[in-house]
Amino acid sequence: MSTQLRTLAVAVALAAAGRGALAQSATPAEFWSALGDTTLVRLVNETRLTNRDIRIALARASAARATRTSAALDLLPVVSTRAGYTRQRIASASLPGVSGAFPDQNVWDAGLALSWEVDVSGRLRQSLRARGAQAEAAAEDVRDVEVSLTSQVASVYLSLRGAQERLAVARRNSENQRRTLEITQRRLEAGRGTQLDTERAKSQLSATLAAIPTLEAAIESGRQRLRVLTGRSRLDELAIPPCETAVELPDAPALGALEQIVRDRPDVRSAERQLDASTAFVGAARAEYLPKLSFGGAAGYTGSEARALGNTGTPRYVIGPVISWPAFDLGHVRANVSAARADEAQSRARYELSVSQAQEELETSIVTYGKSRERLRYLEDAAAASARAAELARLRYTEGGSDFFQVLDAERTLLERENERAVGRTEAETNLIAVYRALGGANVFRSAAR
């Protein structure tokens, strides 16, 4: 009995540890704070608390822990109460040597019943091990859902910010182009310009303004997606104030130091725990080849009247061991063992695949992120040079030192370069989130200026 109680105590402790692990995983990661965007941190925290997918994963983890506790309780004796009433007639023919008719009888019964399977074969312990591994896998699934959803929230948010930046670029360039149009109109009125220059300026301004509705729609779509991910029912509750600073882009981590981190990813750890559970289920299935030893018993009172129950003349009890063995059903046992081994083979393949895919995702995301940071530096230089060139072209045209084609070309190039810079920054930021996702939420970045 003491062995079974110790096993139950271990199961309860594991359940408490699982709840602690979930609570710890729900705290905001330093990674998000290091990015320097308070709105992003707020959205990530709200997602952890209110997202429905996370709530579903938490409910599954709770169910898995309850199943583990139930498996632990199977190791202990089961005591139940019973009370009942029957009316019976006994035929005299069923009692040899007795003649005559027996009158109908009332039988009142109340007492306790005991049943206990002694885990001689280890079947119950293997089942407990399997359920424990499944509970741990469910806890890792919660972490995986959290990492996946918070990464998705961050990617949507950063794409929204990118659309906002491109919208600002379009509006800023449209204002510059509107001033250029006014210059061409004044020159035309003064007899120093041409109608062709004015129409070209109008065409370029209209093309720039045409991009604004599309960007506004992209921003609204991003807000709607964030509303769903954060679990909000109303869009007006989702406040996204203007962001004055860009997200910090840290240096990419070194690949050589990340092999263990890959195996600590929640999806990989979940696959590993599922493999352990499948192995334990094989052991439980094989244990069915061995006999089962159980103890059963009952104690209570029986009488012809309810008020007689409890009197010294009405007690009864029964107790004894029972040994059972499926001697004529071993084919069924063999089939169950084969099925369990097939499940174990699937779980092993899933685990190996998860490790391989995790390594691929991590290596690809780190290389992509590093190259996107490098590309962003060039795009920023190109945008700055284009801004200077556009300003010089407008100045030379105003002073009569160049034709209008140079102004159009410089302004068109400026719009393209600033758009490319905004897109490049969004790509670098979302690639950073992809690295975080590939790391399974681990924060191994070193803060650095771009």
Question: What residues fall within each predicted segment?
Answer:
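Sec/SRP-type N-terminal targeting helices
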Residues: 55-56, 72-73, 118-146, 196, ...
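Bacterial N-terminal signal peptides that target proteins for export
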Residues: 1-9
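Small/polar, glycine/serine/threonine/aspartate-rich low-complexity segments that form flexible
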Residues: 26-35, 82-113, 236-254, 283, ...
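Amphipathic alpha-helical coiled-coil scaffold segments and their short linker/junction regions
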Residues: 48, 130, 193, 197-207, ...
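N-terminal signal peptide c-region/cleavage motif recognized by signal peptidases
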Residues: 18-20
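Periplasmic alpha-helical coiled-coil/stalk elements that build and connect Gram-negative outer-membrane
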Residues: 124, 140-257, 368, 372, ...
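Acidic, low-complexity, intrinsically disordered peripheral segments
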Residues: 234, 249, 399, 420-450
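Bacterial Sec-pathway N-terminal export signals of envelope proteins
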Residues: 22-67, 246-276, 326-327, 352-355, ...
